[in-house]
């Protein structure tokens, strides 16, 4: 909003790497595969996730799984990531849903298909 940078790019990169590899405790690999963005959970039921260059999201629901991560928070984050096309690992074919393209944020130019 203000454009004020509060951490250096190197610190941000380090924090996102740690979030991606360990932020969801022993299920971090599954989280990264399913949701596709670095995330950090807390044992109170909160989850913070970051899609670099796109934005962040937060969830809260106190029902936890065996790893200590919010069950509903994971479901919500996965749904939002897929709907909004936030995953770092999504192929070009996995674009945001049409309803998400009308939401806030920068608009992507639409590609026109070539017909022969």
Residue ranges and their predicted role:
Residues 1-113:
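Structured C-terminal helix/loop/strand segments within mature extracytoplasmic catalytic/sensor domains
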């Amino acid at each position: 909003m203000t454009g004020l940078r509060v951490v250096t790019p190197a610190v941000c990169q380090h924090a996102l790497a740690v979030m991606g590899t360990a932020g969801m405790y022993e299920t971090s690999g599954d989280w990264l595969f399913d949701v596709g963005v670095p995330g950090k959970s807390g044992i109170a039921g909160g989850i913070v996730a970051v899609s670099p260059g796109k934005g962040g999201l937060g969830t809260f629901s106190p029902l936890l799984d065996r790893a200590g991560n919010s069950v509903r928070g994971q479901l919500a984050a996965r749904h939002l990531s897929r709907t909004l096309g936030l995953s770092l690992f999504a192929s070009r074919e996995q674009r945001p849903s049409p309803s998400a393209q009308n939401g806030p944020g920068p608009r992507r130019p639409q590609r026109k298909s070539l017909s022969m």
